[in-house]
Amino acid sequence: MPNSIITVCCFCLSLLVGSANAQTASEVVIEAFKGFDQDYREKWGFDELREDGEKTWFGRFSPESGGLWTLMRVDGRDPTEEETAEYLEEKEAQRERETSDDEQGGPPRSPIDSIDLTTLVLEQDTSESLVYSFLPVGRGDQAKMMKKMRGELSVRKSDSCIEYLEITNPKPFRPQITVKLNRFFSRFDFGSPTSESAAVGATCENIVPLGTQFEMDMKALGLMNIDVSVRATYSNFVLFSAPES
């Protein structure tokens, strides 16, 4: 009997110690994003392969002179002057969106800023990753719309790094009276810009987006249909300048 009591006490004590050492969901996610390099476009050059349902665009980004894009190929051939002009105009518009301030509803500087850390719920715990659901947050005009969305992210166990982040709408809704959003899906895949794979005990640093996906199906005024699907992958990263210490 005494041995049984001791065994039970030891088991209970181990549970208490384990609970004390366990990280909260917000701590896990904050740690997973610590390695994200929010200034990666100031340091790294890379290729972008983008498919928009009509054409496949292959371009190269360089951080020189504040960020330069060069269109290399379109559908495997040399681009026309019109395609080059269209590409550069779109990239400039993208740059303006990404650098817009909070009041203009620009995207968050770091992906973690789109997560309400108080709403994290562990959905899956596998041998390789932890998958959490969350409620996303937006800025400016996007704040109200984000309340209708649901988010999901995955943290890799081998190095405690973020793997992907998704935001989607569980069901159709009207962000405005005259607009119905049937489908919204946004996904970012993250990883190291080098070819080194994550290993047990590896550190989580210099994490950048390696792929993006965006889908939207929207109807405006009951007449205009907007159906967008864009996928992009990023590769061949070259360090332009070493991060300042």
Residue ranges and their predicted role:
Residues 7-16:
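Bacterial N-terminal signal peptides
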Residues 22-149, 161, 168-181, 194, ...:
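Structured extracytoplasmic
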Residues 151-156, 185-202:
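Extended lipid/amphipathic-ligand handling interfaces
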Residues 165, 212-214:
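Beta-strand-dense domains in secreted/periplasmic systems and polymorphic toxin scaffolds
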Residues 208-210:
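RNase H-like DDE/DDD metal-dependent nuclease/strand-transfer catalytic core used by mobile genetic elements
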